[in-house]
């Protein structure tokens, strides 16, 4: 049966990628359908109960700046907030929150159900309908057909998912949910390049069976941070601490004695796991010289006794899991509520994607999230928003939005995926961004909200708040650059208190703010300082960063300007690189395989040398000269 309503965009999967994709397309005015095998699991946190972290928090802020839901839902469901790297420079500071699973999921569900232009439907998708080289819709498990010119596939770990506990295994998308076997088979038939990856999760513990008195308590920050640019600490529910304990030599002995029962080390699991979130057995094997590893006990919520022991993800048999847990200080009598497990799943080579996250081989079909080889809620949400927005733009006949590496961590993420591919689950870090000084958490809105407004992602409330903030920054910056501090009007004691030494001559307040030890608040406390100082902490933060890091930021912007020419020089999509004289066979093969969109992308493909880039530039120049000559003769 064909469903009577025709949609503009269909999103398959209701995880972090799918929910952001559906919300984005609907905000842009497209009739959007979100299909999930179970509406009750929309926005579910399948693994750890936390959002953010180094690099990841930057992505969450960018999603928020573009009108996405993740940051706001975290503010409503977050039960502990911290700023990581708070003592370091602003480029690497990152927000991280523990979230109440129930509250977070409810916040996402509320937004989905109240979003205009968005329809929800509970059915597993078994098939894609394709006409020629374009997707035309999907078919569910009961044979119900939905039609749309754009489909965003966000299948997570469900494609041919296989759960392992010891040497036992069974098909599942995650614990308690069925896998997407028919859909996985259909994608194989479409000849999309694919592979297998693996991830895992630790056993969950009952807090009532844990001795927290022997552990180190880890409270959240005070004052409590917020994630969304529109958020406030008043939105947060009650705050809870986390606790830290650690493994010991007995723990490690138990693991080593049972590695032959591990599906990872017995050859049962073929998929590659995440390097930066390894299982406890992988840690013991890879870091054999360490006799202890930290374990962080994270509460799952305000209304449950369930504890997430971050650091002991494992797929060992249950009896070994129990022995591991009870060898750890404070967990000697711990009761396991759910066993840990590993899950293998299909992913598709992201080098088969355009910068818009549309597949190169099937028009209108977009991939986002773990299907592209990434790991993490935040990476999924960012891809989902971009894929949903670009699906909507395509339906509306508008040009795709492909953020550059110097514009957003989202640009870094997508560029890494489509030019380099993945050999293991990809996780975002600040170190992956060469322009990270200008890609900070604190300025995500200044970088992206105007673009979001242009695309139709940003509503009137967010836009008004953003414009007010931007105007306040510009106004106060201008005032500081024109107001003079005169040493004859400021007592020597105040000069030394604020500036660390006396003023030798009059100076502009903006110049004084450049000094490392000087803050905006301390400057405004000087006698004769401009009246009515700015009180918005977000505005003050931008003033201080602009003053103290302007030289570094200017140098980075010069580097960006040099790189922009390569990023804006496009390569023909149908170019046969065998036609480019001088390229080696190896380079020709790689370029024909990856089909880079720009010279910049080509240069980031492994094995493509500067000499090869020079040959491409010569070819483009000759082509342009030939085209001009033809036009003149015509």
Curated annotation (Swiss-Prot):
Binding-site list for FAD: 13-18
**Which Pfam family is one of this chain's hits?**
GIDA
What SUPFAM superfamilies has UniProt attached to this entry?
A: FAD/NAD(P)-binding domain
GO terms of molecular function = flavin adenine dinucleotide binding
Q: Which GO terms describe its biological process?
A: tRNA methylation; tRNA wobble uridine modification
The cellular location(s) given in this protein's UniProt record come to:
Cytoplasm
User: Which cofactor does the UniProt annotation name?
Assistant: FAD
Q: What is its main location?
A: cytoplasm
Query: Could you say which residues bind NAD(+) here?
Result: 273-287
Q: Which UniProt keywords apply?
A: Cytoplasm, FAD, Flavoprotein, NAD, tRNA processing
| Domain of life, per lineage | Bacteria
The record's section on InterPro entries has: FAD/NAD-bd_sf, GIDA_C_N, MnmG, MnmG-rel, MnmG-rel_CS, MnmG_C, MnmG_C_subdom, MnmG_C_subdom_sf
Tell me which GO cellular component terms the UniProt record holds. cytosol
Q: What does this protein do, in the record's words?
A: NAD-binding protein involved in the addition of a carboxymethylaminomethyl (cmnm) group at the wobble position (U34) of certain tRNAs, forming tRNA-cmnm(5)s(2)U34.
Question: Quaternary state and partners of this protein?
Answer: Homodimer. Heterotetramer of two MnmE and two MnmG subunits.
Query: Which protein family is named in the record?
Result: Belongs to the MnmG family.
Instruction: Return the HAMAP family for the record.
Output: MnmG_GidA (MF_00129)
Q: Specify the protein name.
A: tRNA uridine 5-carboxymethylaminomethyl modification enzyme MnmG
């Amino acid at each position: 049966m064909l469903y009577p309503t025709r949609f503009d965009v269909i999103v398959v999967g209701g995880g972090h990628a799918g929910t952001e994709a559906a919300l984005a397309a609907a905000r842009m005015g497209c009739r959007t359908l979100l299909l999930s095998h179970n509406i009750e699991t929309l926005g579910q946190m399948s693994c750890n109960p936390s959002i953010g972290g180094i690099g990841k928090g930057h992505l969450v802020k960018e999603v928020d700046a573009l009108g996405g839901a993740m940051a706001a839902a975290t503010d409503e469901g977050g039960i502990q907030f911290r700023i990581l790297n708070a003592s370091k420079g602003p480029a690497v500071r990152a927000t991280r929150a523990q979230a109440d699973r129930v509250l977070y999921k409810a916040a996402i569900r509320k937004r989905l159900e109240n979003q205009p232009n968005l329809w929800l439907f509970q059915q597993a998708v078994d098939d894609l309908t394709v006409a020629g080289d374009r997707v035309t819709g999907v078919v569910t498990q009961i044979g119900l057909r939905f039609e749309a010119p754009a489909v965003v596939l966000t299948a997570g770990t469900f494609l041919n998912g296989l759960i392992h506990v010891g040497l036992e295994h069974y098909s599942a998308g995650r614990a308690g949910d069925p896998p997407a076997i028919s859909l996985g088979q259909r994608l194989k038939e479409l000849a999309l390049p694919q592979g297998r990856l693996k991830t895992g999760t630790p056993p969950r513990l009952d807090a009532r069976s844990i001795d927290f008195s022997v552990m180190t308590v880890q409270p959240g920050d005070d004052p409590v941070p917020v994630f969304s640019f529109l958020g406030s600490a008043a939105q947060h529910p009650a705050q809870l601490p986390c606790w830290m304990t650690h493994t010991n030599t007995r723990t490690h002995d138990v693991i080593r004695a049972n590695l032959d029962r591990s599906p990872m080390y017995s050859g049962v699991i073929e998929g590659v796991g995440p390097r930066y979130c390894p299982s406890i057995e992988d840690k013991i094997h890879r870091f054999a010289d360490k006799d202890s590893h930290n374990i962080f006990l994270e509460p799952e919520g305000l209304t449950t006794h369930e504890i997430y022991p971050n650091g002991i993800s494992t797929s060992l048999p249950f009896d070994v899991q129990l022995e591991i847990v009870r060898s750890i200080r404070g967990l000697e009598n711990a009761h396991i509520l759910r066993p840990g497990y590993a899950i293998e799943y299909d992913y598709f080579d992201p080098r088969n994607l355009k910068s818009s996250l549309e597949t190169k081989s099937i028009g209108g079909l977009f991939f986002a999230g773990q299907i592209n080889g990434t790991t993490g809620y935040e990476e999924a949400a960012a891809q989902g928003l971009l894929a949903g927005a670009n699906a909507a733009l395509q339906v509306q006949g508008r040009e795709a939005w492909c953020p550059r590496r110097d514009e957003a961590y989202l640009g870094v993420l997508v560029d890494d995926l489509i030019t380099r591919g993945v050999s293991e689950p990809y996780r975002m870090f600040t170190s992956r961004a060469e322009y990270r000084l200008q890609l900070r958490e604190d300025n995500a809105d200044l970088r992206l909200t105007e673009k979001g407004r242009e695309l139709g992602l940003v509503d009137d409330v967010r836009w008004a708040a953003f414009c007010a903030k931007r105007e306040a920054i510009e106004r106060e910056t201008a005032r500081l650059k024109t107001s003079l501090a005169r040493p004859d009007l400021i007592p020597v004691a105040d000069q030394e208190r604020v500036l660390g030494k006396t003023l030798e001559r009059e100076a502009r307040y903006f110049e004084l703010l450049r000094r490392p030890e000087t803050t905006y608040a301390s400057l405004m406390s000087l006698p004769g300082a401009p009246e009515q100082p700015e009180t918005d902490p977000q505005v003050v933060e931008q003033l201080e960063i602009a003053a103290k890091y302007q030289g570094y930021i200017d140098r980075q912007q010069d580097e960006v300007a040099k790189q922009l020419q390569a990023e804006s020089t496009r390569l023909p999509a149908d170019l046969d690189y065998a036609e480019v004289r001088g390229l080696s066979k190896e380079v020709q093969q790689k370029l024909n395989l990856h089909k880079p969109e720009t010279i910049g992308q080509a240069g980031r493909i492994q094995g493509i040398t500067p000499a090869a880039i020079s040959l491409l530039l010569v070819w483009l120049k000759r082509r342009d000269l030939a085209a001009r000559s033809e036009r003149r003769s015509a």
